[in-house]
Amino acid sequence: MSMNFVTFNQDYSYLAVATSKGFRIFTTDPFAKSYETKEGNIAIIEMLFSTSLVALILSPRRLQITNTKRQSTICELTFPTTVLAVKLNRKRLVIVLEDQIYLYDIQTMKLLYTIETSPNPNALCALSPSSDNCYLAYPLPQKAPPSTFQPPAHAPPGTTHVTPTSGEVLIFDTLKLEAINVIEAHRSPLACITLNSDGTLIATASDKGTIIRVFSVPDGRKLYQFRRGSIPSRIYSMSFNTTSTLLCVSSSTETIHLFKLSLQSQSPDATPSSSLTAADRRSSQSSLGQLSDADDRVGDMGSSELASRKHNGTLMGMIRRTSQNVGSTFAAKVGGYLPKGVSEMWEPARDFAWIKLPKSNPGPGANGNNGPLRSVVAMSANTPQVMVVTSDGNFYVFNIDLSKGGEGTLTKQYS
């Protein structure tokens, strides 16, 4: 049996695991199995909060909505190409294909809208759990340039979009069924995006993985900018806590970073601007794009991260926290004298706390992948804890000191 897919529900109270032989659902606090079926090769599973409604991908193009309590199938849908991701909240069901996104009313399963996208093989997409701020975020589609070649009449229609070359995010209102903003988040193409539980914040990371940015939604103001490290890394998972005061980030390194969303770490340009016109917004986004270029370059050549991260929670941790405080204070003072584009190079804040994943042998639910250890992260709604699920079939719980930060402590482990 191999593990195909793993995800938390919208409030992190449940964990769902899709395998080559059925699926399992666990409560996270306490960690315990609440449902299991051993039928079917399940590619993707998504839950609707703590309800018995579960969305399953049983074959590449077939979606099944199931009621686990009644053990009945509510509906089935077949799509023209492979389903790469499924997102849902109490108002909307979102199906992500490589070059299309389908929006459904989850109450009636009526198709509301179809979005044409650029090729999106990694299914980059985020749906807000909120029923009020019901926003969808995905990479801005990039139109294909006009071709001088005239294909024969019998040829299938050519592609209308090309793979994005920059990291722009489109914000779509799934209630009004209209695009409402474009955020120029990164110079490089996007690797990961996530929305908070209220649908008021979005975190973004590019394929370089050195800089993490947080913007307000829907207006797209940049609020925070964090440095994960100076060495490029693939970002696998990002998650806000339920109060949106912390952001947890996992990557192809075995260090998980926690960033504090506080006034001290806000960007200098994070002041409200309620009277922005469309032209003003385009202008501000253009200038942000130029700053993003500088920030991403700095991300590649900035101060080197301690490769070994051999923190023992005492001397090294104290030195690290002290240097962070000095750095942020110095940047704040210098930022007042430097031009904005230059001051932002000083700005990215380091992590507030971090977690080192333990070395472990693949468990019985592992997928057998010999590549980098992939992980999905979430933060408990009730306690200062980080939950981590890894591709080798392990579930970890770490305690975090919210007052001092530093290295998290492993308290529970399940395989």
Swiss-Prot record:
InterPro entries in the record, alphabetically?
PROPPIN (IPR048720), WD40/YVTN_repeat-like_dom_sf (IPR015943), WD40_repeat_dom_sf (IPR036322), WD40_rpt (IPR001680)
Could you tell me the membrane topology recorded for this protein? Answer: Peripheral membrane protein
The organism's place on the tree of life at top rank: Eukaryota
Each WD repeat occupies one of these ranges, namely 1-36, 69-114, 139-182, 185-225, 230-269, 310-356, 368-408
Write out the GO cellular component annotations: endosome membrane; phagophore assembly site membrane; vacuolar membrane
Where in the cell is the protein located?
A: Preautophagosomal structure membrane; Vacuole membrane; Endosome membrane
Q: Note the SUPFAM superfamilies from the entry.
A: WD40 repeat-like
| GO biological process assignments | autophagy; protein transport
Residues forming the motif L/FRRG motif are: 226-230
Please state the protein's primary subcellular location.
membrane
Q: Which Pfam families match?
A: PROPPIN (PF21032)
Provide ranges: composition bias, Polar residues: 266-277
Which Gene3D superfamilies is this protein grouped with? YVTN repeat-like/Quinoprotein amine dehydrogenase (2.130.10.10)
> Keyword annotations for this protein?
Autophagy, Endosome, Membrane, Protein transport, Repeat, Transport, Vacuole, WD repeat
The ranges of region (Disordered) come to: 266-315
Can you state the subunit structure given in the record? Component of the PI(3,5)P2 regulatory complex.
Family of the protein in this entry: Belongs to the WD repeat PROPPIN family.
Role, per record: The PI(3,5)P2 regulatory complex regulates both the synthesis and turnover of phosphatidylinositol 3,5-bisphosphate (PtdIns(3,5)P2). Necessary for proper vacuole morphology. Plays an important role in osmotically-induced vacuole fragmentation. Required for cytoplasm to vacuole transport (Cvt) vesicle formation, pexophagy and starvation-induced autophagy. Involved in correct atg9 trafficking to the pre-autophagosomal structure. Might also be involved in premeiotic DNA replication.
Its domain description in UniProt is: The N-terminus might form a beta-propeller domain involved in specific binding to phosphatidylinositol 3,5-bisphosphate (PIP2), leading to the association of the protein to the membrane. The L/FRRG motif is essential for the cytoplasm to vacuole transport (Cvt) pathway, for the recruitment of atg8 and atg16 to the PAS in nutrient-rich medium, and for its recruitment to and dissociation from the PAS under starvation conditions.
Kindly provide the name given to this protein in its UniProt entry. Autophagy-related protein 18
- What is the taxonomic lineage of the source species? Eukaryota, Fungi, Dikarya, Ascomycota, Pezizomycotina
